[in-house]
Amino acid sequence: MAPSNLPSVFNATSQDIEMLLAAQCHLGSKNLQVHMENYLWKTRADGVNVLNVGKTWEKIVLAARIIAAIDNPADVCVISARPYGQRAVLKFASHTGATAIAGRFTPGSFTNYITRSFKEPRLIVVTDPRTDAQAIKEASYVNIPVIALTDTDSPTEYVDVAIPTNNKGRHAIGCVWWMLAREVLRLRGTIYSRETPWDVMVDLYFYRDPEAEAEEKVEEEKVPGAEEEGPAAIESGFAATGGDWEAPAAGFAGATGTGWDGAAGDEWGAAPATTEWAASAAPAAASGEAAKETTW
């Protein structure tokens, strides 16, 4: 499925195509913009439009060549207001040196020089033309080229390079941003050859739920067997103590000889005999009085 109008060095490998398919980059929406018909492969029976991943790869390479042509990497601004793309743009910026805007785009960042967030980038890359419409609109005012990840229903006004892909799934967004960063580093020479694999895993670009990460951290910090009940708790406690139920404790070693003997026939339920402490103290008191009466 490699495009024929690219030099052979830019052709996608089977692993790249399989990765795009595994991340569901080829699955679009049920709506179709007229400008996205060129990237359509077919429409499924359930109405979902399927994109041509060969053209997706072609546009990834084209976008990477545009980004690599800019001398100062900080002049490239990557933007994502969609939560699934915020982690991806931050990782892309850290690996390529671009400027990232993750979250809400402050209006006037490209047009109002009085604001603190004012920027003058030479190129912007957005995750979704619909959610990042403010950034695209301001870029059109100041003649900034725009690269966008576009779905079948995405508006393409003021978009100069459209990368056809699924821009709603977290795996698809992360996969495309990872491939774009890898191609930029290859063109810059950071990755020496195309046969050399990139040591950064694609999972690093995927969105992660903060609540799920907090729950996983709490689960890791829990004591093993703290929430177990019934036989499982008994077995875990038995294993923790070493499993030796026969060995008596050191404190009870001397008490075994003076313990209750069932053969003696004693009534263990009977009340204990009362100890008359006053009677035992009487002789001592009498001797004390006699000592007082003795005159030396």
Curated annotation (Swiss-Prot):
Source organism, top-level taxon: Eukaryota
Compartmental location: Cytoplasm
PROSITE patterns: RIBOSOMAL_S2_2 (PS00963)
Any one cellular-component term (Gene Ontology): cytosolic small ribosomal subunit
Biased composition (Low complexity): 263-289
One protein family per Pfam: Ribosomal_S2
SUPFAM superfamilies, per the entry: Ribosomal protein S2
Stored InterPro entries: Ribosomal_uS2, Ribosomal_uS2_C, Ribosomal_uS2_CS, Ribosomal_uS2_euk, Ribosomal_uS2_euk/arc, Ribosomal_uS2_flav_dom_sf
GO biological process: ribosomal small subunit assembly; translation
Family according to the record: Belongs to the universal ribosomal protein uS2 family.
Name recorded for this polypeptide: Small ribosomal subunit protein uS2
Classification lineage: Eukaryota, Fungi, Dikarya, Ascomycota, Pezizomycotina
